[in-house]
Regions:
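Hydrophobic anchor at the beta1->P-loop junction of P-loop NTPases
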Residues: 25
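Domain-level recognition of nuclease-like catalytic cores that cleave nucleotide substrates
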Residues: 402-424
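Conserved catalytic/switch belt of AAA+ P-loop NTPases
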Residues: 86-110, 118
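N-terminal pre-Walker A segment at the start of P-loop NTPase domains
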Residues: 1-14
Length: 424
């Protein structure tokens, strides 16, 4: 890439390097981990350099310390190819007694973790990178700051320049750094290429087990149809069998989903468990999401025009895009993103909960007055359920929209914010 676009993870990486001897950057292939780490590295070891790959792996077995020589911070790219390096780095960090020594990047969890005997607690810290948010790719004006909403700002203003057609394109293009400056039609090809690579090779890297590409495709299609749903593996198996006429066992679904998780293609969302005024059963299962909406679009074989003609599917994939962006922003604020749903049917699409105890409630709606009103009503009923004697009241309620030219605060205090105006 000619020009490095600043990432939200840049500042997080610097902060983490100040506090620990080694930082492990994880995330999907193509999301920019190596490029981000290269910006601060004083020396670099590319484990998968074709000319040196076998030599590097052999050296990691015989004399791993040799590979760690170099100015700090030393970047070790695709470290998972040589899991023995983990213990060697832990040992080296212990003996140097300094922070900021190593940055490791990896697009998969090591297929064989038997070589790792220590957890790395106290020496390593983790950083998850995802594809770019709209703010990072230059598609959001960034005039509304999420941090300001947590600090209690009352008025907001911000414009969004995204038309419905442009938004459909951005869902299908995804946040892959390489595609941001490409012509639109070429950019759309890249998500399909990414999907093909997952189906035919990347998913096998996760556990060194060859998988049936046709089954992988069908499972990924089912996963795409269930974005934002709390769907167990049994239901995914039934969905594949019913719609694809290809029987698949629950065990196979579990193995394939686990492999997709290990290569960071899926990132499911945990349930939020607040203190409530009255007892109700909270649904504790995770919510299904791809790490980027473009993977879901590719798995369904659809493009921007298809989304415009099928607003229901567009709504689901728009939610995946918003969750991606909120996760990127939450990381910068020391927060996590959760989902809430209970047996009474009360739901909240996203809850950003910060480490300091503050939290915000968010409903995601593609747009239009009717849907925005639905979102506001849901947020207000969710707020009323929370027992504020036992926990803080929410810092804000927000309807996050796709369409709409500007952000504003309603008279009832709810923020309405287009995703094309938001930043961390």
């Amino acid at each position: 890439m000619k020009n490095y676009r600043k990432r939200i993870a840049d500042d997080i990486l610097m902060r983490k390097l100040e506090g620990k001897g080694a930082v492990l950057i994880e995330g999907p292939k193509w999301c920019g981990k190596t490029t981000t780490a290269e910006q601060i590295a004083a020396s670099i070891l590319y484990m998968d350099d074709p000319e040196k790959k076998e030599q590097n792996i052999t050296m990691s077995e015989l004399n791993p310390k040799r590979l760690l020589k170099g100015a700090a911070p030393r970047l070790i790219d695709e470290w998972q190819l040589a899991p023995k390096l983990w213990d060697a780095i832990r040992f080296e960090v212990d003996h140097r007694g300094e922070t900021g020594q190593f940055v490791l990047t990896g697009s998969a969890v090591p297929a064989d973790t038997r070589e790792i005997t220590h957890s790395g607690t106290g020496r390593f810290t983790w950083l998850t990178m995802r594809p770019m948010s709209l703010y990072e790719s230059g598609d959001s004006t960034g005039e509304v700051c999420l941090a300001d909403l947590f600090s209690g700002t009352s008025e907001i203003e911000g414009d969004s320049n995204l038309s419905i057609d442009r938004l459909a394109f951005l869902v299908c293009r995804g946040g892959w750094p390489q595609v941001v400056d490409m012509r639109d039609e070429i950019a759309l090809d890249q998500a399909m290429d990414y999907y093909d690579a997952v189906v035919h090779s990347d998913i096998n890297r996760a556990d060194n087990v060859q998988k049936n590409p046709e089954r992988v495709k069908r499972l990924m299609r089912s996963y795409a149809r269930n974005q934002g749903g709390q769907v167990p593996n049994t239901v995914l198996a039934q969905d594949v069998a019913a719609s694809e006429e290809m029987p698949i066992s629950e065990e196979t679904v579990a193995a394939y989903v686990s492999a997709l998780r290990k290569i960071f293609v899926v990132e499911d969302m945990p349930a939020w468990n607040p203190n409530l005024r009255s007892k109700t059963a909270i649904r504790s299962s995770d919510t299904r999401y791809y790490i980027d909406p473009s993977i879901a679009a590719a798995a369904l074989g659809i493009g921007p025009d298809d989304l415009i003609n099928d607003l229901k599917t567009f709504g689901f994939l728009f939610e995946t895009l918003c969750i991606r962006d909120l996760r990127v922003f939450a990381d910068a604020l020391n927060g996590e993103v959760y989902h809430y749903r209970d047996k009474d049917g009360q739901e909240c699409d996203a809850v950003i909960h910060l480490r300091n105890g503050k939290y915000g409630l968010i409903e995601i709606k593609l747009g239009g007055d009717k849907l925005i009103e639905e979102g506001v009503k849901s947020l207000k009923s969710m707020e009323a359920k929370i027992d504020t004697d036992k926990m803080n009241a929410p810092s804000f309620l927000m309807v996050l929209t796709g369409t709409g030219d500007y952000a504003y605060r309603r008279q009832d205090g709810v923020y309405v914010v287009p995703i094309g105006s938001l930043k961390n």
